[in-house]
Amino acid sequence: MNLSQSFLLNRYIQSPRTWLHRLNSNNKIYFLFFYLSIFPYTDVKYMTYSIIFYTILFLYLKHIDKNYKIFILRIVYKVCIFTLAISCLSKLLLSVNIFRLKYISDFFLNLMSICTRNILYIRSVLILTHYFCTVHITFMTTTYEDIIFAFIPLFTQYQNNIIKKVAFISIFALQAIENTLIKIYSILITIKMKQFTKVFKFQYYIYIYLILKFIQDIYNDIYRISTVFYVRELNHKMSYFTYIY
């Protein structure tokens, strides 16, 4: 059985290649693994800066087929305009009597107080957003096989049941998740193409049918995979990892 068969290639950008593609896959994966491990312990301010950087990087990858110099200039231009607008607005508010410095200070103090009370939720949202952006950009610039093979030296060095279980489950879990996402995208495309939203009389019945069909497909996939594992007696004890690069 080919465990390195990838269902994530639909995210990978084959062409054109960027500087992220040319980085060594092992070094890139090790750095991101270490970076994501220490990221939850950083300050909220640095989390926000990091998410802004990832957003710019993500937009850059989305528009890589265009002239990237013009795209970068547009981003810098928009950031400068936004900064200038905030600066002018602040000076305008300070010049108006109704918005004195005292009221502006109270506003920022109240805003900081609200952020402090909800700092746990803010950190959670920032961490989840950062993880999502990091994983998505990694899959856009690194093949799934390179990600798995980056950890092969560790698997060969520490051959024990726990690592084999984690590797065995992770390989099939990622493929199953991607297959589930493909099913969801197919349902959404079907709804848009058939224009079910215009059929008000049977709209909810169609949605219920699609949801039940989706659950039935997931059950069939689980049953089929479990049957194959049982018939062929596949488990983590049969996993043998070797570094082929």
From Swiss-Prot:
Q: Is this entry keyworded Chaperone?
A: no
Chief location: plastid
Asked if the Swiss-Prot or TrEMBL record annotates the protein with the keyword Transmembrane, the reply is yes
Q: GO CC: one term?
A: chloroplast membrane
The record gives the membrane topology as:
Multi-pass membrane protein
**Superkingdom in the source lineage:** Eukaryota
Query: Which UniProt keywords are given for this protein, alphabetically ordered?
Result: Chloroplast, Membrane, Plastid, Transmembrane, Transmembrane helix
Spans through the membrane: 38-58, 79-99, 119-141, 171-191, 199-219
* Subcellular location, record wording: Plastid, Chloroplast membrane
According to its UniProt record, which protein family does this protein belong to? Belongs to the ycf92 family.
Protein known as = Uncharacterized protein ycf92
According to its UniProt entry, this protein's organism is Gracilaria tenuistipitata var. liui
